[in-house]
Amino acid sequence: MGKFQVISHPLIQHKLSILRRTTTSTKDFRELVDEIAMLMGYEVSRDLPLEDVEIQTPVATTVQKQLAGKKLAIVPILRAGIGMVDGFLSLVPAAKVGHIGMYRDEETFQPVEYLVKLPEDIDQRQIFVVDPMLATGGSAILAVDSLKKRGAASIKFVCLVAAPEGVAALQEAHPDVDIYTAALDEKLNEHGYIVPGLGDAGDRLFGTK
């Protein structure tokens, strides 16, 4: 079974509390998602492998560390996942970015995929799938399905808020995928929204309804 971790860093929890509030403006919401994503990126990249490299400083030759192993890719689930991309890129600017577009059928609560645009070498990369919400788990499962169909094998899922139902569904469908979240909330309501949650992340990011 893959790792499941709630990242309880004080700065993340403080910013998440502001993010949840109904009074938080679109501008502030967007900035907070970016900031939390960057902080989470720092945490979820802790186990990236390193290798020795010889470099020359102005004073001497020395052996130091650099990232090794697979190159990185960030794959947001559209549209809300876009809000988390820049936070990750501020840490790993050389990472490539793919996109998986989905919308939720409001009657069945099931995701419908409408776009998959990925780096050609996606099968050779460590992938961070990002989406602010892990609700039913349907979108996350479909996104990982799409990646695995294209040969991807090293995948982590990163969200800001998760429901227990979504975590369980993703773990059952893809037990090899690590899941990271800033909060594990209580449940889903009858409309498939996370409680207490933070509302519709896409609408709040982009000022739409």
From Swiss-Prot:
CDD domains named in the record: PRTases_typeI
Manner of cofactor binding, per the entry note: Binds 1 Mg(2+) ion per subunit. The magnesium is bound as Mg-PRPP.
Reaction(s) this enzyme catalyzes, per UniProt: UMP + diphosphate = 5-phospho-alpha-D-ribose 1-diphosphate + uracil
One Pfam short name: UPRTase
Means of activity regulation: Allosterically activated by GTP.
Residues binding uracil: 194, 199-201
Cofactors: Mg(2+)
One GO BP annotation of this record: uracil salvage
Pathway stated in the Swiss-Prot or TrEMBL entry: Pyrimidine metabolism; UMP biosynthesis via salvage pathway; UMP from uracil: step 1/1
The protein's Enzyme Commission number: 2.4.2.9
Top-rank lineage group of the source organism: Bacteria
Top EC class, one word: transferase
Alphabetic keyword roster: Allosteric enzyme, Glycosyltransferase, GTP-binding, Magnesium, Nucleotide-binding, Transferase
N-terminal signal peptide: none
GO molecular function, one term: magnesium ion binding
Binding site for 5-phospho-alpha-D-ribose 1-diphosphate: 79, 104, 131-139, 200
PANTHER family: ADENINE PHOSPHORIBOSYLTRANSFERASE, URACIL PHOSPHORIBOSYLTRANSFERASE, CHLOROPLASTIC
Assigned protein family: Belongs to the UPRTase family.
UniProt function note: Catalyzes the conversion of uracil and 5-phospho-alpha-D-ribose 1-diphosphate (PRPP) to UMP and diphosphate.
Official protein name in the record: Uracil phosphoribosyltransferase
Organism this protein belongs to: Streptococcus agalactiae serotype V (strain ATCC BAA-611 / 2603 V/R)
Gene designation: upp
